[in-house]
Structure formats: C-alpha cells, structure tokens
Amino acid sequence: MRYYGEEALGLVETVGMVPALEAADKMLKAADVELVSYENVGSTLVTIMVKGDVAAVRSSVEAGAVAAAAVGKLTARNVMPRPIGGVGDIVSVHDIDA
C-alpha cells in the first residue's frame, strides 16, 4: 500500500524475519491499521511499517514491539504522528498491494 504521509506511520524493526512476522501479525490484530511495507536491511534487519490514526498506530506498534521481543530481538520502534509527505517515497519501496 502506497504511503503518502496523510496518516500516522508506525515502524517496528527486528533482527530476523521470525520476530518481524510475529510483530506484523500482532500489529495488524491489535488496532485498525494498514500494512504499508516492509524493508530488509542487509540479511539481518527487517522493518515492518503500518499506517492509521495516531492512537491506533501507537497501540499497534506497542503490541508489535512486545511480540517481537518475546520471540527474538527488537532493535527499534517508532511512531511518527504526521510525517512529511516525502517520507512516503522512502517507506513505499516495498509497498504491499491491498
């Protein structure tokens, strides 16, 4: 799903795919958010990105971070309440088709 900066953006970064998938599952179940994309950095780091209203994204990121840490290594999490539109060009490299 293409991101244009119109909603809050939430990110959870992990070491490896297993905690990333666990985070994505919990993030999407925890709140009314949409999966934007994922990003692999090298062969180790995976970042999952979701969008939605600020409260939903905060809840989603918290649930994803807890889930990732329970099965692997969480390296970062962040909620950007209203990022500038140009951020969409960066985070939509591997956008997920709806």
Residue ranges and their predicted role:
Residues 4-14:
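Short glycine-/aliphatic-rich beta-strand segments at the starts of folded cytosolic domains
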Residues 10-12, 46-51:
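Short cationic amphipathic helices and targeting signals
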Residues 18-29:
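Short amphipathic alpha-helix segments
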Residues 31-32, 65-73:
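A common structural junction motif
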Residues 33-38, 76-77:
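A short linear hydrophobic-aromatic micro-motif
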Residues 51-57:
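Helix N-cap motif at beta-to-alpha junctions
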Residues 70-82:
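Conserved short beta-strand edge segments in small beta-sheet-based binding/regulatory domains
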Residues 86-98:
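Short, low-order "capping/linker" segments at domain edges
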